[in-house]
Regions:
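Perimembrane loop-to-helix junctions flanking transmembrane segments
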Residues: 64-77
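Extended, low-polarity transmembrane helix blocks
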Residues: 5-59, 77-85, 92-149
Length: 149
């Protein structure tokens, strides 16, 4: 092998890696099926997590009924019932993609209230509420995707 062949093979290797690096750094838009599958996975994961929070509140209903925070001045029990409705029934609609944006409105209200009123807009104290809020806002904007009821 001459020096010229080694140099041209090295240049070819670099060019191939540049293409791969370019594809990695600047990927092409994904097709709608893979994006819809991603939205489905996000809906199922965050919806199930939200549903579990609602089940915990339903399970401890009698203890929480009188001590649940009431930031909207509608009563502790009504606030708790609204949160259980949002976290259980609306999360099922969220996961299924049925009446998607309509089912997200109570979920967004609960997370906005939790983050700004209960946790005082502190990311340190209200980290989970902030994560749910950001995911729900992005999902509200993007819609449920193709894999929805």
């Amino acid at each position: 092998m001459t020096g010229m062949n080694i140099q041209s093979e090295g240049l070819l290797f670099i060019q191939k890696n540049e293409i791969r690096m370019k594809d990695f750094l600047f990927p092409q838009p994904t097709d709608s099926k893979s994006f819809s599958l991603l939205l489905l996975c996000l809906r199922l994961f965050f919806g199930l997590m939200f549903l579990l929070h609602g089940l915990e509140k339903l399970y401890n209903y009698t203890e929480l009924c009188f001590v649940f925070p009431d930031p909207m001045n509608i009563g502790s029990e009504i606030s708790l019932l609204f949160v259980i409705f949002a976290e259980m029934l609306c999360s099922i609609g969220f996961m299924a993609g049925a009446l998607f944006r309509l089912s997200m409105i109570p979920m967004l209200i609960v997370m906005i209230t939790a983050f700004f009123h209960i946790h005082g807009a502190s990311i340190v104290q209200g980290e989970l509420a902030f994560i749910y809020l950001m995911v729900f806002i992005m999902m509200y904007i993007s819609g449920p995707g193709q894999y929805a009821v």
